[in-house]
Each structure stands twice: as structure tokens, then as C-alpha cells.
Amino acid sequence: VGASEVVVALGPWAHELLFELGYRIPLFVKRGYHAHFADGAMLTRPVLDTEQGYMLAPMKRGIRLSTGAEFASLSAPPTPVQLGKAESAARQLLALGPQVERMPWKGARPCTVDMKPVIGAAPLHKGLWFNFGHAHQGFTLGPVSGRLLAELMMGETPIVDPAPFAPGRF
């Protein structure tokens, strides 16, 4: 496949590819867990327990329990300790139904040392563009990051100052 322009938007896997191309972007992974429980108690609003480090969110078919984050490599096996403690604390607060999925969801959130995404032209390769490193805000920032990158690629005036996100800052 040939292309004059290529976007690297590989989340936590961007580091491995870009290292081979000579880039040393300090990207690390924070990992979090979610578990989905059938309706036990009725929950109409999200509940955040900052002391125990978890959040409960109502869903159409149950309740989603999510935890904070842990530092782990992409290949590290799951560590269910955090999720187990959060589930125990949540069950003291309200009656969670049985867990819907056999295995909880585990997500790797790509983070840079300054906690800002990497968006813009690659400094070493013409036609190579970056859009990754959004940490916990990947779904939230995805649309506006895509817009910013498209504006940069098209030579248009960007919606925001792209300098804080420039790949060359590392």
C-alpha cells in the first residue's frame, strides 16, 4: 500500500513503531478496569467514591463499575486486586447484581509525561503525522483531535494552537 500521507494513531502501540523510526516519545501506559453488573439496585445517576477509588455508572442493562488506574506494561497480565476492592466497597453501598461478563474489561491508556496528546507533523519524516497519547480522554478528545490534525494536514487555520501538542516537544 502506498500513500503520500500517513497518520500514526495507534494509542499505546505507537511507541513501538515510532521507536523503530528514530522517535523517542516518552509514552507510558496507565491501565484501568471496568466490570458490568446486572441490575441489583436501581441506579439513576453516576456515583463516584473518591475514598475507595471507583465509579458506578447506570447503563441500560445494569451498572458499570470502573476503577482508577495502575501503571503496567502492555503485556502485563491483569491484576484484579483494584477491581476486587472496588467491587467489595460498592457492594457495601448498594446491591449489585451478578457480573455480566466473565472477564472484566481492561484498557491501556497511552500517556505522555506532560499528559498532553501528540498531534501534528512528524519532525523526521515528511508526510508522517501523529495523533496519539490521549490518556484517559481518548474517546472524549478523539473528534476534536481528528479535526485539529485534519486542519494541520490541509494547511488550514487550526481550531486551537497546536504548539502544546507538537511531536517536536520531546
Predicted feature residues:
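Active-site lid/adjacent beta-loop-alpha segment flanking the redox-cofactor pocket in flavoenzymes
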Residues: 20-28, 37-127
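Predominant activation on well-ordered alpha-helical scaffold segments within soluble catalytic domains
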Residues: 15-18, 87, 147-150
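Glycine-rich phosphate-binding loop signature in dinucleotide/nucleotide-binding domains
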Residues: 1-2
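C-terminal lid/capping helical subdomain adjacent to the catalytic/cofactor pocket in oxidative enzymes
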Residues: 118, 122-170
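A generic structural signal for short beta-strands and their flanking turns/coil linkers
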Residues: 31-33
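Flavin (primarily FAD) binding-site architecture
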Residues: 5-24
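Short, glycine-/Ser/Thr-/acidic-enriched flexible segments
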Residues: 13, 70, 136
